[in-house]
Amino acid sequence: TLVDETLDELTREKLRAFPPDLVGITVPFPGNVYGALRIARMVKSIHPKARVVLGGGYVNTELRQLSDPRVFDFCDYITLDDGERPLLALVEHLRDPNQPLVRTYVREGNRVVQKTTPALLDLHHRDTGTPTYAGLDLSQYVSLFEMLNPMHRLWSDGRWNKLTVAKGCYWKKCTFCDLSLDYIARYETATADVLVDRIEALIKETGQTGFHFVDEAAPPAALRALAERLIARRVAITWWGNIRFEKSFTKELVELLARSGCIAVSGGLEVASDRLLALMQKGVTVAQVARVTRAFSAAGILVHAYLMYGFPTQTEQETIDSLERVRQLFAEGCI
């Protein structure tokens, strides 16, 4: 197809300009798998001695029980969870095969084997350093949006530097969530000043002052500390991120977040039914969500809510009632 040919040509151009020894490909979603494998195949075709490693969100959730060795026709290694330690171990292993690997799948014969070394610990969130866009021509990226809703547009319209306020989830109780996954289970924070240092470094590198905090759910206390340090250090940014609609987000805190540059939040309402919210162990009620979303909206902050229908035991009447409560939230300008 035209898309295939375009992807192949772009890959060839990069491989000719920068002959690699090691290529890492992030596979965040199912829709990225085909492109990732196509790029990996091209790397192997042009530079047979280059090593290819896959990682990312899709790998972390869907390939934890990998048993089919055919994927290694395209790549050499697959790493799980946070990439810093596995990639560092892989680089050292390629220099010296006696060095151990960490959470890395390899093919041995016709079998998939996971190599790991528990003694080699992951880097703490405070020590992972600042993300970098070095070598990436950001001017080549265009803004796209599929609808006029200003909240929905944020995901693809504009330029957002990505950062994480805290690693993992501080709540870790929702029954529909896989709490065993490292990116949820291992909760770690960094100081507000460390976060502001990273923000300033990204602004200097990219020239962009828009930030998307991609936490599972940013902790209210950490957001308060971050907002206070942004204001105290006179760092002017525009930011948005994911939260839980919990009572800690008072009118006073929400107004502080707005002053620090917050323009939008996204959170999981899931179902507008207190019985089902209790079954989910969400730790919120419909009335509480209404109060919190109203506080954000009153401060001029856009609010997006995730919803799900057909949760186990949900009755027809509960579905109707939930739809009506969501309609009321829209009508009142809360979301």
Question: What function would you assign to each model-found segment?
Answer:
Residues 2-123:
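Glycine-rich beta-alpha loop elements in corrinoid/cobalamin-binding modules
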Residues 43, 47, 230, 293-296, ...:
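Hydrophobic positions in alpha-helices of CheY-like receiver
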Residues 44-50, 231-236, 330-334:
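Short helix-capping segments at alpha-helix termini
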Residues 110-163:
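N-terminal [4Fe-4S]-dependent radical SAM core
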